[in-house]
Amino acid sequence: MLIDFIKMHGLGNDFVVFDARKGPSLALSGSQAAAIADRRTGVGCDQLIVLEPSTVADAFMRIYNPDGSESGACGNATRCVADLLHRDGIAAPCMETVAGLLLAEINGNGICIDMGQPGLGWRDVPLAREMDTLFLPLEAPGLKMPAACSMGNPHATFFVADLAELDIPVTGPLLERHPLFPERANIGHAQMLSRSHIRLRVWERGAGLTLACGTGACATLVNAVRRGLAEREAVVELDGGQLLIHWREQDGHVLMTGPAATVFHGRIALESITG
């Protein structure tokens, strides 16, 4: 059986999107998702997205990491899905995830997603025990005392003087799986270029070092503001490009604005890849 998919990306953070809103349902196992995400023997992606019908939104987004685990949120994928829905004739797409509803606005600056309010408490992240999320007792070579929050998924942000001095492929997997994070964590590495310009690299939970991480950019601005390092609106520069992040003061919602692109449409014989 051939299944249609769309290959999309947001700042190089790439996705395989299956649209099962109107056709047959698509229930993937973790091993199937991992096989599709494999860049050598599958289609290849940072995350796999299955769109399902929703009773409260235009679509339900099920998000798989390349290791087959599920994620509660992905900012870049949400922009891609919003673009897809917008091209289907939906003016202001609304996406449902396990972390809640996400609203989109398409304008001349790109696709703006209301990512909702960050979770700032230790249970929100979550952490293994009660502590101040602004300064975690966590260290690695060149890294110490990150701030943590949740953007629908757990994030820890280290603020550093020079990103070039870090060995993220070595420290990233160790920090991601640190016992302090019972659900693992996305590990951000942020260099403050100014109060309105942040350079960021993210080791993503279940995906590794990616070209861009939308929720990571949101979490980094939130943590930078909490530390008194940034204004409430800033450009976050990732390896794949820039996002504009605004932590709105009146309601505490985080707004993320950036691009999305469709690369190609394809068909996959699921049984031939996953055996």
UniProtKB/Swiss-Prot annotation:
Q: Which UniProt keywords apply?
A: Amino-acid biosynthesis, Cytoplasm, Isomerase, Lysine biosynthesis
Q: Which GO terms describe its biological process?
A: lysine biosynthetic process via diaminopimelate
What's a Gene Ontology MF term here?
diaminopimelate epimerase activity
| Chief location category | cytoplasm
List, from the UniProt record, the residues annotated as the active site of this protein. Answer: C74 (proton donor), C213 (proton acceptor)
Q: Which residues bind substrate?
A: N13, Q47, N65, G75, N76, N153, N186, E204, R205, G214, T215
Q: What class of enzyme is it?
A: isomerase
Q: What does this protein do?
A: Catalyzes the stereoinversion of LL-2,6-diaminopimelate (L,L-DAP) to meso-diaminopimelate (meso-DAP), a precursor of L-lysine and an essential component of the bacterial peptidoglycan.
What name has this protein been given in UniProt? Diaminopimelate epimerase
**What organism does the UniProt record list as the source?**
Granulibacter bethesdensis (strain ATCC BAA-1260 / CGDNIH1)
